Amino acid sequence: MPLFIATGPGPYPSHRELHPAFYGCFDWHSCVEMEWVVIRLLRLFPGDVPLDRARETLGGLLTPRNIATEIAFFNNPNHRSVERPYGWAWLLTLQHELEIWNDEDGARWAAAVRPLADLLCANLIAWLPKLTYPQRMGMHGNTAFSLLRSLDLAERRAGEGEPDLLSAIRTAGFRFFAQDTEYPAQYEPSGADFLSAALSEAELMSRLLDPARFPAWLDAFLPGLAESQPASLFTPAIGGDETDGQIAHLTGLNLSRATSFVRLAEALPAGDVRTPALLDAASRHARVSLPAVTGGDYMVEHWLAAYASLLLGP
């Protein structure tokens, strides 16, 4: 399915004209992801980032004028489903990163981006009740992953007296996933996955459920974790041709799995019998794909750093 569908005669604007804040990468959501990576590294490891160049670049992108153009794009009725929900969720992730960063530039950029984040929050709130079924896949449409990526900002907004997004996420999460049992994770992965549908759902529910209820839910959902079962879920994915954009997704699957394994272990009580298997799997998956974050083909490099950065923690 094309990213843009012609509804009239050309000429058509360039990607940079449509998206002056998020352009220059393979697609819009990858631009958002990689700008988030730079912001995250500036916040966590400022001494290891080319500081002046990073700030200058972000400062030229994240301006009120550029964000107004982005808003105009998403306000166009023809674009109402573009980047839904994956790109929306990554934009909310970027906004959250800016807001928790104690930095003068970060505060200015957060103020600039917030109107776009507010629009996509409102769009997500309006869309979730219409979603009859969740999408359980290992790619961009995965519902659980996008809810998870949106959750940090939703919780922050709720703490500021704006609970609507958090309420929408919780309602959707419980409606779609709370009753799930014996998930067939033995059929993962598919040949173009960069997410685990099973682990994305489990990680989301680790955030939504009461900590006392989550261990039992997880046992019913994925009953073999203590024994590293199903084996296909605990075995790092084997990629192949990194110049093929679909096959290249499998390199990222290992990192997204590693992150989920760690988060699940953190959500379980001390001494839980599943924790050693989860942490061992996280380590093995990360070792396979971390070397590909830099120095590889563009079809991997243009997005993989985002999934490596998720491993850094909250």
Give the predicted meaning of each segment.
Residues 120-201:
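Loop-centered beta-sheet repeat module
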Residues 15-32, 72-89, 130-144, 183-198, ...:
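Solvent-exposed loop and edge beta-strand segments that line ligand/cofactor-binding
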Residues 48-65, 104-127, 160-180, 213-226, ...:
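Extended, well-ordered alpha-helical scaffold segments
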Residues 20, 24, 32, 41-154:
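Extended ligand-binding groove/face enriched in aromatic
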Residues 101-104, 208-228, 233-314:
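Terminal, non-catalytic domain-edge segments
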Residues 1-23:
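Low-complexity, Ser/Thr/Pro/Gly-enriched N-terminal "stalk/linker" regions
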Residues 6-8, 12-14, 171-192, 231-240:
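Conserved catalytic-core motifs characterized by acidic clusters
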Residues 35-48, 89-105, 146-160, 200-211, ...:
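Well-ordered alpha-helical scaffold segments within catalytic/enzyme domains
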